[in-house]
From Swiss-Prot:
Swiss-Prot/TrEMBL GO biological process terms: translation
Domain KOW: 5-40
Any one Gene Ontology cellular component term annotated for this protein: ribonucleoprotein complex
Residues in coiled coil: none
Family assignment from sequence similarity: Belongs to the eukaryotic ribosomal protein eL27 family.
InterPro entries: KOW, Ribosomal_eL27, Ribosomal_eL27_CS, Ribosomal_eL27_KOW, Ribosomal_eL27_sf, Translation_prot_SH3-like_sf
GO molecular function, one term: structural constituent of ribosome
Top-level taxon of origin: Eukaryota
Keywords per UniProt: Ribonucleoprotein, Ribosomal protein
Protein name per the record: Large ribosomal subunit protein eL27
Species lineage: Eukaryota, Viridiplantae, Chlorophyta, core chlorophytes, Chlorophyceae
Length: 134
């Protein structure tokens, strides 16, 4: 079987607390691990997307609406729906160990937020930063 869920692929989380949210695969485990003996992936996603900004709004309001919130999660392949999009962001601050240690996870989330905000400010990959309508 062809492995098409590679790192950088944009996916939609289908179940759980973040169902319907867009995420990017950071690291994939096709054969599983000893603790999780099934195919899964470490994903970084948008918990809260940036809102629409207009020129009429003040700088303060524009800055507030441009913020985003991220999440880091290990998800079973059955609960991911791949899209045709990719996002080339280097999430080197996110490791598999960040999932187990809560303090490392908080630091990794902050790092991911910073990287995704930089990507958002460039104006590329607009689809990823919009709310999924359903």
């Amino acid at each position: 079987m062809v492995k098409f869920l590679k790192s950088g692929k944009v996916v939609v989380v289908l179940s759980g607390r973040f169902a319907g949210k867009k995420a990017v695969i950071v690291r994939n485990f096709d054969d599983g691990t000893s603790s999780r003996p099934y195919g899964h992936a470490l994903v970084v996603g948008l918990q809260k997307e940036p809102r629409k900004v207009t020129k009429r709004q003040s700088q303060k309001k524009q800055a507030k609406k441009s913020t985003l919130k991220t999440f880091i999660k290990t998800v079973n392949y059955n609960h991911l729906m791949p899209t045709r999009y990719t996002l080339d962001v280097d999430f080197k601050g996110v490791a598999a160990e960040a999932q187990e240690n809560p303090t490392k996870k908080v630091e990794a989330r902050k790092e991911c937020k910073k990287l995704l905000e930089e990507k958002f400010k460039t104006g590329k990959n607009r689809w990823f930063f919009t709310k999924l309508r359903f």
